[in-house]
């Protein structure tokens, strides 16, 4: 694996010079191998090690290099044709392969090659970009988008129209991460490498980036870039220091543990916020 990483790191330093026409065989094979490993879930761009999320930057670099070494090509679809550098994940799947991997894909869901989809996942008409990791038992609902290299945990529900930000455009240092057992409400956006920790519930229409203030109304504490575990979050506003205006924020209205979350439905958690 170290040899593979070294090839990627070296090639990335001269990425501006690389084109589909001049990419050498060693680089091309290394990049394709990494994409295949990401696609199978054997590697992932970020993983939790000793309780902390660690981003493997060289894997992200391999994803970026894949755009340098591959030319656009015609991609056949059910209703149309496409022209892109990245093949679709399911292009060569047959019924036996789908059954073996154990997830459902509802048309016209689109998943790029290099994204991993775990067992018991349901993809409604949605989009999952290259390098993303979607873990077991997760629902990606209609028109939800999982951005490049985003990490989605087990038993997560991404509601209709949710946007989970990617790292490639604009280029971000770390992927957006949604940990296990989270619920992200309809039309919410979580971007710029924000981490939503385990068991959190994000209400409909909440927008969280690195500069968004995440205000805990119980403690008065303000978080940036991280939603603490077990938070129930709604959109809100905080007043300016001079009191003349207010600016958008996300508000943690309560905290719940796994036991409470198991007994009380998501809708009930969001309705009883007073």
Swiss-Prot record:
Entry similarity comment: Belongs to the transferase hexapeptide repeat family.
PANTHER family registered for this protein in UniProt: 2,3,4,5-TETRAHYDROPYRIDINE-2,6-DICARBOXYLATE N-SUCCINYLTRANSFERASE, MOLYBDENUM COFACTOR GUANYLYLTRANSFERASE
Annotated pathway: Amino-acid biosynthesis; L-lysine biosynthesis via DAP pathway; LL-2,6-diaminopimelate from (S)-tetrahydrodipicolinate (succinylase route): step 1/3
Stretch forming the signal peptide: none
Localization per record: Cytoplasm
Top EC class of this enzyme: transferase
GO molecular function, one term: nucleotidyltransferase activity
Any one of the GO CC terms: cytoplasm
Keyword Repeat: yes
An example Gene Ontology biological process: diaminopimelate biosynthetic process
Domain of life: Bacteria
This protein's name: 2,3,4,5-tetrahydropyridine-2,6-dicarboxylate N-succinyltransferase
Enzyme Commission (EC) number: 2.3.1.117
Keyword list, A-Z: Acyltransferase, Amino-acid biosynthesis, Cytoplasm, Diaminopimelate biosynthesis, Lysine biosynthesis, Repeat, Transferase
UniProt-listed InterPro entries: DapD_Trfase_Hexpep_rpt_fam, Hexapep, Hexapep_transf_CS, THP_succinylTrfase_dom1, THP_succinylTrfase_N_sf, Trimer_LpxA-like_sf
Reactions listed under catalytic activity: (S)-2,3,4,5-tetrahydrodipicolinate + succinyl-CoA + H2O = (S)-2-succinylamino-6-oxoheptanedioate + CoA
């Amino acid at each position: 694996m170290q040899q593979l990483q070294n090839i990627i790191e070296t090639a990335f330093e001269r990425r501006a010079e690389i084109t589909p026409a001049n990419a050498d065989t060693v680089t091309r094979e290394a990049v394709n191998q990494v994409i295949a490993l990401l696609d199978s879930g054997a590697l992932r761009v970020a993983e939790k090690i000793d309780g902390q999320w660690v981003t493997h930057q060289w894997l992200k670099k391999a994803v970026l290099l894949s755009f340098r070494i591959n030319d656009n090509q015609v991609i056949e679809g059910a209703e149309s044709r496409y022209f892109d550098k990245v093949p679709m994940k399911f292009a060569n799947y047959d019924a036996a392969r789908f059954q073996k991997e154990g997830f459902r894909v509802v048309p016209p869901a689109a998943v790029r090659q290099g994204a991993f989809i775990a067992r018991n996942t349901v993809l409604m008409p949605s989009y999952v970009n290259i390098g993303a990791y979607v873990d077991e038992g997760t629902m990606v609902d209609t028109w939800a988008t999982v951005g490049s290299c985003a990490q989605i945990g087990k038993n997560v529900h991404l509601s209709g129209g949710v946007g989970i930000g990617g790292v490639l455009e604009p280029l971000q240092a770390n992927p957006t991460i949604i940990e296990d057992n989270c619920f992200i409400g309809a039309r919410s956006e979580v971007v710029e490498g924000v981490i939503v920790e385990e068991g959190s519930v994000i209400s409909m229409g909440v927008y969280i980036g690195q500069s968004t203030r995440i205000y805990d109304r119980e403690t008065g504490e303000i978080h940036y870039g991280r939603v603490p575990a077990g938070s129930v979050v709604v959109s809100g506003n905080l007043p300016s220091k001079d009191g003349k205006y207010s600016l958008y924020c996300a508000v943690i209205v309560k905290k719940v543990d796994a036991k409470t979350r198991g007994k009380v439905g998501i809708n009930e958690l969001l309705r009883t916020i007073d």
